[in-house]
């Protein structure tokens, strides 16, 4: 029962309904936030759990609104907040802010505005645009930066729009060391060359992953099956780890349901999903009370250096969250 929805909204509700009719216990693989909202609404009507490894829109935290949704990542409000912390460390006192008008972009915009206020950073110019906007439209917005003296530029948008944004950055010459660019998405291996050139030097948050026996086992299996070397600084690899953990999460919930001599139904599995507490490949997995969010997930801020000699995406860690205080620590200047 596998459906490839390409992170698009189109026909997502029908796709989820088709899976529900097959009497599945749970649905995994909700990645992008906008379609994940549709998935969560659709699955909740049938009491079917839906698990995400990448949809981090702030609104998806709401357990009352999305009672059958969970995610093995932290919400975007923490990601965006840490980007503002980094900008403050680099001396930013005013920024330009680009965001999409989908559910994720609007939620992220509220977070960025609140964090900027707390950091005494002035959002001088805001540019909003619809998800999947045309290259021409994004070009026109980025071109307006020429009329400003803003050197710190923020973007919160899904990956396809992030790629178009960096194409525009490259086109208009903003991929220069005097500019600091912060984006909420890590670009992937298949990103076009002109977008890669525009993205060199930008900062992006990603899930932090700690060494463990579970991770060692995953790496061994990953490398054997793919023929690739695990790269801890690659978004592709990190998301593969999170994707693996959503499978283990459902497995743990089913085992817990059986152990308690409960009937294995989607409702009982959902109740056990919320009680989960185990060591996954990406670290300890448990959930905040009254929320759909993973508890205490570490975050790293990465800097993109371009592609290396082997044609691989090259990111280096710049900062990470402290496991005790939750504050951002700069680890590489």
Over which residues does each language-model region extend?
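Extracytosolic ligand-binding ectodomains
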Residues: 1-333
